[in-house]
Regions:
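N-terminal glycine-rich FAD/FM-binding segment characteristic of electron-transfer flavoproteins
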Residues: 1-148
Length: 148
C-alpha cells in the first residue's frame, strides 16, 4: 500500500465488519478500480489486515478526502475524529445502530461485499467499454453511484 492518505481524494476505509481477509482482498481490488487509497480502523490494524501507518483516527491519521467510504466501519469516536472533515462520508454497514451512520452523508445499510461487488462491476464494465484506456471514475461519478 502506497500513496499519501492526507492527499487522497478518495479513501476506502476497512473495518472489522469486512469479517475476513477474502473480503478485505475484495476491498483492495475495488480501491484499485476506483483509484482510492486504502485505510483502516484500529480494529483492522489490530487484526493485521491494514498496516499501522494506514490507520485513521485518534491514534492514526486525520484525513479530509473528497470522499470517505467506510466499509464495515462501526464509527467509534476514536475513528471519526480522524475522518469527520471528509467532504462526503459514505457508510456501508449492516448494523442500523452503527455510530458512523450519525455523521454519514450517505448511509447504506447492506452487506458491504454486495455493495463492493456492485461498485467494482459498475466501473470495471466502463473500463471494458474503453479498452484502449483505463477509466477511473471521477469524484462526481462515484457520488452518482452512491446517490442512486
Amino acid at each position: 500500500m502506497t500513496g499519501d492518505l492526507q492527499a487522497a481524494e478518495v479513501i476506502l476505509c476497512c473495518g472489522r465488519g469486512l469479517q475476513n481477509k477474502r473480503n478485505l482482498n475484495l476491498a483492495f481490488r475495488v480501491a484499485d478500480c476506483i483509484q482510492a487509497q486504502i485505510a483502516g480502523t484500529r480494529a483492522a490494524v489490530d487484526l493485521g489486515w491494514i498496516p499501522a501507518n494506514r490507520e485513521i483516527g485518534l491514534s492514526g491519521a486525520r484525513v479530509e478526502p473528497q470522499i470517505y467510504i467506510g466499509c464495515g466501519v462501526s464509527g467509534t469516536n476514536f475513528h471519526t475524529m480522524g475522518m469527520k472533515h471528509a467532504k462526503k462520508i459514505i457508510a456501508i454497514n449492516t448494523d442500523p445502530l452503527a455510530p458512523i451512520f450519525q455523521i454519514a452523508d450517505i448511509r447504506i445499510e447492506e452487506d458491504v461485499c454486495k455493495v463492493l461487488f456492485a461498485l467494482m462491476h459498475t466501473f470495471s464494465e466502463k473500463n471494458s467499454l474503453q479498452p484502449s484506456s483505463i477509466h477511473h471514475p471521477s469524484v462526481d461519478e462515484l457520488l452518482a453511484f452512491f446517490d442512486r
